[in-house]
Amino acid sequence: MITHGFYARTRHKHKLKKTFIMLSAGLGLFFYVNQNSFANGENYFKLSSDSKLLTQNVAQDRLFYTLKTGETVSSISKSQGISLSVIWSLNKHLYSSESEMLKAAPGQQIILPLKKLSVEYGALPVLGSAPVVAAGGVAGHTNKMTKMSPDATQSNMTDDRALNYTAQQAASLGSQLQSRSLHGDYAKDTALGIAGNQASSQLQAWLQHYGTAEVNLQSGNNFDGSSLDFLLPFYDSEKMLAFGQVGARYIDSRFTANLGAGQRFFLPENMLGYNVFIDQDFSGDNTRLGIGGEYWRDYFKSSVNGYFRMSGWHESYNKKDYDERPANGFDIRFNGYLPSYPALGAKLMYEQYYGDNVALFNSDKLQSNPGAATVGVNYTPIPLVTMGIDYRHGTGYENDLLYSMQFRYQFDKPWSPQIEPQYVNELRTLSGSRYDLVQRNNNIILEYKKQDILSLNIPHDINGTEHSTQKIQLIVKSKYGLDRIVWDDSALRSQGGQIQHSGSQSAQDYQAILPAYVQGGSNIYKVTARAYDRNGNSSNNVQLTITVLSNGQVVDQVGVTDFTADKTSAKADGTEAITYTATVKKNGVTQANVPVSFNIVSGTATLGANSATTDANGKATVTLKSSTPGQVVVSAKTAEMTSALNASAVIFVEQTKASITEIKADKTTAVANGNDAVTYTVKVMKEGQPVHGHSVAFTTNFGMFNGKSQTQNATTGSDGRATITLTSSSAGKATVSATVSGGNDVKAPEVTFFDGLKIDNKVDILGKNVTGDLPNIWLQYGQFKLKVSGGNGTYSWHSENTNIATVDESGKVTLKGKGTAVINVTSGDKQTVSYTIKAPNYMIRVGNKASYANAMSFCGNLLPSSQTVLSNVYNSWGPANGYDHYRSMQSITAWITQTEADKISGVSTTYDLITQNPHKDVSLNAPNVYAVCVE
């Protein structure tokens, strides 16, 4: 049987030749291997009056016979010696009852059992006699059957008779060649006629045993939607059918071939079968295994299929920036027909596939583990034509509707039964559907995943001393090139740190400016980064951990996080000791049994040990003694640290002399304005007692003492303390030293002077890319950026009036309401300044699209009085879609209050805040105009 149909399909070409070579090779091999098995199938002949039928009901040997004038089923039964019960058993699907069969009129078809046919070879003409041309078109051949299969010939001819028959054919041809009465082409025609008749017989025998061939051709769109399928029996008996099925299809711009085999086992009233398929998508290089089962009865079919991928992830054939592979899944199918009205059929199917991004409906609608149920009806008015409609409803409310029409031409049957309604019933029976195609999804359902076209990785966290600048190591892989990296460093900025671009040409060259170390605080900050490529694709968010220390160290390994002395001074007698304690942690967790090495960085002293191991609390201790007066600095380091951590300096003093035992500053940063002073304090002791009225000499390498000079003396008070102040009018770093007569210099911790923090009065209007004064007419959600300088270079922002204006971490201000707002900025060195936003003369607020009347109501009759009002806003702020809130909009056409002339004409005027484009005489019910209010 060959069918032709059309379906709704779309879309590419290529690899067609490869596909058909594969099919041709498969079919050729199949025909070669199975050429003898075809000879034992069904045979179709026209019956002559002297043909004899043997009454053996064999499913493979059936005769489709059309009653002639004067013939009835009863007369055929008597003349051929076939019982009516046998004939009825073969015709139940054609007639509603035996009595109806007996009423069959001339021209109607019945099925008769066929085993052997009498063939009269004696009808051949004697050699040399005049030729007789039969209806078949072969001269001298009076065979009363127009078609004869090889098995019938073999069954009715002994070897001798077959040889005799062949000899007679040859003799007949020789006689005709000798006859002078024949014209020159007659011999050739005769030979070709004999050969053609035999070839037609062979071809018909092949065609009627092919089972089913289904062809669907779509003439448009490069034949997208076309398919070709064959079911080919290679072993066929009454109770079992073994078959192969091959197919190819070009659907959605993909060439897919299917190769399968299976068996069907026929019981008296039902059929059980199984099949195995390999599906190959040549376009996308996808391979899938299919395993299915079948259960059929008269008027009912069911099947279940499982689909299992045999190929893995690879670049998608037709979906950019995605990989694809076959999705695993299954489907269950049911088809039923009404016995009383077999032309009408119904279909029910459920399919389920598994994966995160499966294209069950199409590659633009990816779903997770999608399923779909299909219901359909079909109508077959005559065997030649079937029309159907299917509705499929799936996960996520996806659905589609498919209309189809098939034309089925069966080579094994005459034309008449294919266009008469009463023969539809046969298609619905087991015998009539014996060679039907396997019901399965021959298209490979695919699963997709987004390619890693852009990835961002930060392999190392950052650990550094306060106020240091640390380079961030970024690893970026981008298919289309890196455009930018967006950071969320709000936690870092809140303490005066920030992430900033280094200013190089590379888009991935960033550095971290660390804030001040907070004594007793966690000093650990989390920042995130996301990369964007030149096509707008974004990477995953990546987190960076920044740990700030009071001195240089690295702690993403096992490292010393804190190193302190139990006192600031001791006797330089070689006996009194200062005890240091080092705390070792990894990622904030104390570490036991870690060796810590100690070293004297500066000064003269002796360590109690060069190393120690941490206890259960992560603590390691060491003592320091000295017989030499002076200042000493000690460091601690683990094996995994790249630099040691220094403790604060300690002082060894000579007890019998007045000595400085302590020096400190009240802060480590100051404003370089000549006024912000750092106060230094020293303590002078002798024999364990404070020394009163003793002179202390101070020196500095930067700034001025008391605003006068870089050297200054101060006198101790009754508590033995002397103080002095240091200021600077320029930015820089200062180291102050102090000494007493006969003693050593003692250095204080380094102090940094920063320029004063200030905000420029000029702002950057972001949508217009200009710098100037803040306009006194506002566009709601307009944005500008404040420019700040001074401080330590790290800033945090805060708005005191967020209902009026908000500010982000970069100093970008967004206007939200009409009024006055104060924006504060604080630098990492704790300087704070403010910027006051003054209320505007008026503000423009954009509402929704509305008719003129509704717009007036929405705005409380406060529409713009003229186009000039909005033109001024445009001139001050630029196009509205230059700001985040309006970024996606292409037009904001706004109503203008009607003039008197407008009221008479029943129209109004508009102005567009994005394109300008002023209009007059606009209908008051225009659908795409916004209510824009003036506040």
Swiss-Prot record:
Keyword Cytoplasm among UniProt keywords: no
Protein name per its UniProtKB record: Intimin
Site residues, Implicated in intimin receptor Tir-binding: 892, 895, 899, 902, 907, 910, 916, 928, 930, 934
Function text: An inverse autotransporter. Adhesin, which mediates attachment to the human intestine epithelial cells. Necessary for the production of attaching and effacing lesions on infected human tissue culture cells. Anchored to the outer membrane by binding to peptidoglycan (PGN) via its periplasmic domain, thus helping in receptor interactions during host invasion. PGN-binding may also aid in resisting mechanical and chemical stress during transit of the bacterium through the gastrointestinal tract of the host.
Region of interest: Sufficient for homodimerization: 40-153
Keyword Disulfide bond: yes
Organism this protein belongs to: Escherichia coli O111:H-
Limits of the Big-1 domain: 560-653, 660-754
Similarity-based family: Belongs to the intimin/invasin family.
Localization (cell): Cell outer membrane
Further comment: 'Inverse' autotransporters have an N-terminal translocation domain followed by the passenger domain, as opposed to 'classical' autotransporters which have N-terminal passenger and C-terminal translocation domains.
Lineage of producing organism: Bacteria, Pseudomonadati, Pseudomonadota, Gammaproteobacteria, Enterobacterales
Annotated S-S bridges: 859-933
Annotated segments matching region Required for periplasmic localization: 40-212
Pfam family, one: IAT_beta
Subunit note: Homodimer. Interacts with Tir.
Entry remark concerning the domains of this protein: Has a signal sequence, a periplasmic Lys M domain, an inverse autotransporter domain (residues 210-411) predicted to form an outer membrane-embedded 12-stranded beta-barrel, followed by a linker domain also embedded in the outer membrane, and an extracellular passenger domain (residues 450-935) with a tightly-folded proteinase K (PK)-resistant, non-Big domain (residues 450-550), Big domains and a C-type lectin domain. Linker domain is important for the stability of the beta-barrel and spans the barrel pore in an extended conformation creating a large cavity on one side of the barrel pore.
Example GO BP: cell adhesion
